C-alpha cells in the first residue's frame, strides 16, 4: 500500500517548529498508544535534536494495557519519560506538569540562580494528524481553543495557549512524513484512522485488521462474528463475516465494500475491546 500525503502546510509547519524550538523548554510528543512507533514521525528526531521530551501515549483507554506498559518501559530505557493519557476524559493529564517540572528542575534552578524571574513552562506539542493534539489542548486549557475532529489534518496553524499559571503550550499542525517506506506502518496508521480513508485501499486495511486479530486476539474475532473457527482463506473469512452481518447484494452475493466498512468500523469503535497493533519487540 503506497501512501503519499504531505500537504503544503505540513512542510511549512516543519520549518516553523524548527524555529520555535528556541522558545520552548520541553516537547510533548503525542503518539497513539495503540501504535506508539508507527505514530511517531521519523523526521521528529531530526527536528527535536536534544530537547527535553515527554512521550504522551494518548488514547491509552483504547490500547491493550499490558502492551502499553511494555512501551512505557521501552521508552524509559531510552531515557524518554512517558505517560499514559486520555485526552478525551482527562486521564493522566495531571501528571504532565509535575513530570515537566522534574525534568526541567536544573534549568529553572540555574535561571533562578541568575536572578531570572520564574515563569511558566513553555512546551511544544507535536505529533502526526488525528493523534489528539487539539483535544489535549482543549482539555488542558478547559476551553474550546483548538479545532477538533476525526478528520486527519484539521489543525492547520500554530498557536500559543496558556494553561493556568504554570504552562504555555504551542500547538502545531500534525506533521506526517512524505511517504511510508514500511507498508505495515501505513496499515497501522490506516486501521486506527490516522490517515484519510479517501486515499487508502480500505480492503487492504480490513485484511490487515483481520489477520492481526487472527494472530493476536483470535477468540475476540470468533466471538464478535459468531465463528466456530477462523477460515484460513481470507476470502472465506470475508464471506463468513459478510453473511453474519447481512452484507448481501441481490442474489445473496457478499457485498465486499459493505463488509469492509463493517470490519474497519468494528475495529475503530472497540467492538473487539482494547487493541494494540504493535509491540516493542515487533
Swiss-Prot record:
It is found in: Cytoplasm. The keyword Acyltransferase does not apply. Its main location: cytoplasm. The keyword Hydrolase applies. One of its GO terms (molecular function) is RNA binding. Keywords: Cytoplasm, GTP-binding, Hydrolase, Nucleotide-binding, Ribosome biogenesis, RNA-binding. One of its GO terms (biological process) is translation. SUPFAM superfamilies: P-loop containing nucleoside triphosphate hydrolases (SSF52540). Residues 14-178 form the CP-type G domain. GTP binds at residues 58-61, 86-87, 130-135, 174. GO terms for cellular component: cytoplasm. Pfam families: MMR_HSR1. Belongs to the TRAFAC class YlqF/YawG GTPase family. MTG1 subfamily. Interacts with ctc. Interacts with the immature 50S ribosome subunit. 2 molecules of rbgA bind to one 50S subunit. PANTHER family: MITOCHONDRIAL RIBOSOME-ASSOCIATED GTPASE 1 (PTHR45782:SF4). Essential protein that is required for a late step of 50S ribosomal subunit assembly. Has GTPase activity that is stimulated by interaction with the immature 50S ribosome subunit. Binds to the 23S rRNA. Required for the association of ribosomal proteins rplP and rpmA with the large subunit. This is Ribosome biogenesis GTPase A. The lineage of its organism: Bacteria, Bacillati, Bacillota, Bacilli, Bacillales. The gene is rbgA.
